[in-house]
Amino acid sequence: MISIATTYYNRRPQFINTLRSLEISKVKDFEVIAVDDCSDEDQKIDDLEKRFKFLKVYRIDKEDKWYHNPCIPFNIAFSLCKGDKIIVQNAECLHHSDILIRTEQNLNDSNYLSFANYSIDEDTTKKISKHEKIKEFIDSYPMNDNRFDFYGNGVNGWYNHGIYRPCAFHFCSGITRKNLIELNGFDESYANGICYDDNEFLYRINLKGLKIIFEDDFKTIHQYHERVNYIKDNSTHLEAINRNIFNNITQRRLSYKVNNRNVF
């Protein structure tokens, strides 16, 4: 079984598009664990469990949120996963290719699969929902003709690609349950800042000796979304917190396992 672990906040139309893209996979034995990280009432996704039977939603209430970084809700998602293979991804990343079947066939305990991720702008994102069948959009979007590197937020370009931007961050990636347990999820010392959670996770994947495989022929699409308001106002300070942790603590680690508690 494959588990897809994701965190979600105020991007309901984009997430519905992602779920629609999963419906057309040849793989049927999978689940989506989505941790709703205090979304507004009109953006909640609990009702989508009836429409998408593979979806399981865990909601965090606003009074229980003490952190800024998604490492906390991601670790909650990991703890709820039942699959022996886990896809770690953002809620807004729809599957342009059959990521599930590639994960089923190629993921093992010695590797980490990094699926290509292409960013689309706001106008293109709005057009997706107009397609009655998500495959119509997937088949019509000429991603292979757009080979320039990503150069800003909300524009068309590669977020992750083995040739054009090989960062291997978890826009959409595959890792076995065994390896994720041994890593013990994301490092929760990053909870009070923003960014660098992806850097630290990748650093420990390398430290563990997993082979990073860029799956450029298996693509995902990052749909446009606005930044969280409180992060907009305080981003410089919050990013500095985690940059300091990464530079002065993470990069001096000798062990790939983190946290003082077992995530699983």
Task: Indicate where each model-derived feature is located.
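Conserved catalytic core of nucleotide-sugar-dependent glycosyltransferases
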Residues: 78, 96-97, 101-184, 188
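Cell-envelope/extracellular polymer assembly enzymes that use nucleotide-activated donors
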Residues: 1-3, 31, 200
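Short, acidic, metal-binding catalytic loop of nucleotide-sugar glycosyltransferases
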Residues: 20-29
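A conserved acidic beta->alpha catalytic loop
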Residues: 36-45, 62, 93-94
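Short beta-strand-to-loop acidic/aromatic patch adjacent to the donor-nucleotide binding site
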Residues: 83-96
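C-terminal catalytic/acceptor-binding lobe
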Residues: 167-169, 189-264
